[in-house]
């Protein structure tokens, strides 16, 4: 594993810390390491939730390492499994990822956060896609994911001028889930992670699968699709031991014990 990436396992929760002073920028080597970490998380049956954060209190990530770019790393370089930052192109990850944004999330750093399922950010966090000012475009998900969250006028301003969005504005628009103080950031992310662990893993996997498959469909078409039998996790949930355990635990006034089957 890269020395720029620190992994910590807390039971079923994996914490990934990007630590590349001064701005936690990501070059191809670091991106490969991040992809390996996320794929291992995906494939490890003991892990349920991942938290990605940045080292320090100023930068979550400034995105692509422009020093590496100046030294010849191309914008379309091979950034490894999972695409840039290891997460932006993993489309079969059925476990939740929380981005704990501790500071500036610019360019690919913002795209990394957008690829997560939840964003918890510190009050000093801000978000921007300044690629157009550098002669490139935010093609690691920024131009694809941001329009699903914001009105076109706001998206156009952000991607064409590089305008920054504060943590509070991001909360108002629903881009982030929570805004907390810097000192409370990881505590808040871990609290959310534990809430996710308390939910049934198969149900979480089915929800992510359904979201991916039906997000662009009309509601009626979505109903037909999820009942067509083509999905992997949804039918499994209906006939799982966990589907029996949930109501049984509720009736017995105890916490459910999920088996993931």
Swiss-Prot record:
Protein name: Carnitinyl-CoA dehydratase
Swiss-Prot/TrEMBL keywords: Lyase
Organism: Salmonella newport (strain SL254)
Gene3D superfamilies listed in its UniProt record: 2-enoyl-CoA Hydratase, Chain A, domain 1, Lyase 2-enoyl-coa Hydratase, Chain A, domain 2
Active site: 111, 131
Documented EC number(s): 4.2.1.149
Reactions catalysed, as given in the entry: (R)-carnitinyl-CoA = crotonobetainyl-CoA + H2O
Annotated metabolic or biological route of this protein: Amine and polyamine metabolism; carnitine metabolism
Function text: Catalyzes the reversible dehydration of L-carnitinyl-CoA to crotonobetainyl-CoA.
HAMAP family, per the entry: CaiD
